[in-house]
Amino acid sequence: TFNKMWGVITPQEAADKIEEQKKEAGITEPKNLEEQAISLVGTDIYEKLIKGYTEKQWGRPCTELPSFIIKRLPVRLTFDNNYFNALYQGIPVGGYTKMIANMLGDVEVRLNTDYFEHKEELDALAEKVIYTGPIDAYFDYKLGELEYRSVRFEAEVLDQPNFQGNAAVNYTDAETPWTRIIEHKWFEFGKDEEGNDLPKTVISREYSSEWKLGDEPYYPVNDEKNGKLYEEYKKLAEKEENIIFGGR
């Protein structure tokens, strides 16, 4: 990315350019996501690749988001374009649905069952319960509601073999309403279960939106206000003897 944006070749050239733009922005100690991003990759790449996408995803200006959110993204002064650093990366053959179906085996699965409506009965089934729902919902919002972001998917079947040539493409500009498009066939290298080419393709446009009660909460808003409220709920959770809290 640094090479395409600035024409730099060596890691030192890229580092010098980032430092130059960081100084131009007057940043010494980053106070928010915007300043942290500029410190990491410079103003040009922040405005081209980070600002629009991040503000669509979170529904808030980057200046109102905490700096630690952007720190998890890897920055490499190399030509390695992998997102993860793991030596081995992959997805299950046949997809996650097939893998989960195999894992469940003889396990009883209850669909359309509200845990809270049957809590006493369900808790009695095992010594430990793994709860993966929102922590504020577990405590009936007694300390107030945490804020979440929700996601809406718009699927479309296209009468063509290839739409974008890749499983996921992010749209980093502010003008495009969706954050990314998923072309599902490329998770299986464009083949069906028998290894045949697929003449059509399915895409899903992904839209981020503010969560409200009744919506599906996809991820929590990770700012200072919500962080403080979560810590209070965490104290309550630590007093629950037979419940293991998981999830995002």
Where are these regions (language model features)?
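Mid-domain catalytic core of redox enzymes
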Residues: 115-232, 236
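Residue-level signal for well-ordered alpha-helical segments
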Residues: 14, 31, 76-80, 84-86, ...
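Short, highly charged low-complexity linear segments
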Residues: 17, 190-191, 243
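Short FAD-binding loop at a beta-strand-to-alpha-helix junction that anchors the flavin cofactor
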Residues: 237-248
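Active-site/ligand-binding neighborhood in enzyme catalytic cores
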Residues: 2-128, 132, 136-139
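Short linear sequence elements within intrinsically disordered, low-complexity coil regions
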Residues: 7, 51, 58, 63, ...
